[in-house]
């Protein structure tokens, strides 16, 4: 394979990687603009959790936080 083709493949791969990373950051910003809380952030009846995560509260309802779903935890465990 010629060096020009290798350079082109490298550049296309780098652009793809950067675009995927930018898309992740954009989706995080969109969720915060919608007014939802991410994983392990505070939540309430007026501030819901993003991505359908459950809002888990202490026994006296004073410390509510969004928890990751079992699917997310399972996925993270096997991605390591």
Swiss-Prot record:
Compartment annotation: Secreted
Molecular functions (GO terms): ion channel inhibitor activity; toxin activity
Cystine residue pairs: 36-50, 43-55, 49-66, 57-64
Coiled-coil intervals, chain numbering: none
Tissue: Expressed by the venom gland.
Domain free text: The presence of a 'disulfide through disulfide knot' structurally defines this protein as a knottin.
Protein name: U19-lycotoxin-Ls1a
Organism: Lycosa singoriensis (Wolf spider)
